[in-house]
Amino acid sequence: MPRQVLLRRFVLVFSLIFYLFLALSVPYSATDDWLWGMEEGLRWWLGGMLNGRYAGNFFAVVMCRFPAVKVLAMGLTMFLLPFLMALLAARGEERRFLPLFLACNAGILLMPPAMWQENYGWVSGFGNYVVSALFFLAWLLLLR
């Protein structure tokens, strides 16, 4: 197996493990996430009594009710965002993927702390904002 392929696999596996660890480290917030995890949050979502973000609220309810799902969903989404960005930017040129993947990771990890807290440090915010960005990137990839 060529050295470039091994390096690419190592970087991908390492970043997946890193993002799963980050997802495991995200606590539930007392003001919002706990409410989504209780029966009241489920009633809110089923009744459509909130903000109209039905898909995002669905992810918030599921991630707040099941901690293992939270870790997997957040970790995989955090990993897939730079992965899909790099796939889109590489435009099929395999040699460009790894540098682009590292640059996309750097861009995400170096975002301002206030933005990081709202998107990655808040489970309900993650379900509403980051998951939708992932679906948008997947849609762009399908259109390409």
Protein language model regions, located:
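Extracytoplasmic catalytic/substrate-binding loops of multi-pass membrane glycan-assembly enzymes
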Residues: F21-E39, L46-F59
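Short, Lys/Arg-rich, polar N-terminal cytosolic tail immediately upstream
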Residues: M1-Q4
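Short hydrophobic/aromatic helix or loop-helix immediately within or flanking a transmembrane segment
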Residues: L46-P82
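Membrane-interface micro-motifs in multi-pass membrane enzymes
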Residues: R53, N105-R144
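Alpha-helical membrane-inserting segments
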Residues: F59, M63, M85-A89, L140-L143
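Transmembrane-helix motifs of polytopic, lipid-linked glycan transferases
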Residues: L76-L100, C104-I108, A138
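Membrane-embedded transmembrane-helix bundle of lipid-linked glycan/lipid transferases
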Residues: L7-S15, M78-L84, L141
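Transmembrane signal-anchor helices characteristic of membrane glycosylation enzymes that use polyprenol
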Residues: L6-A30, G107
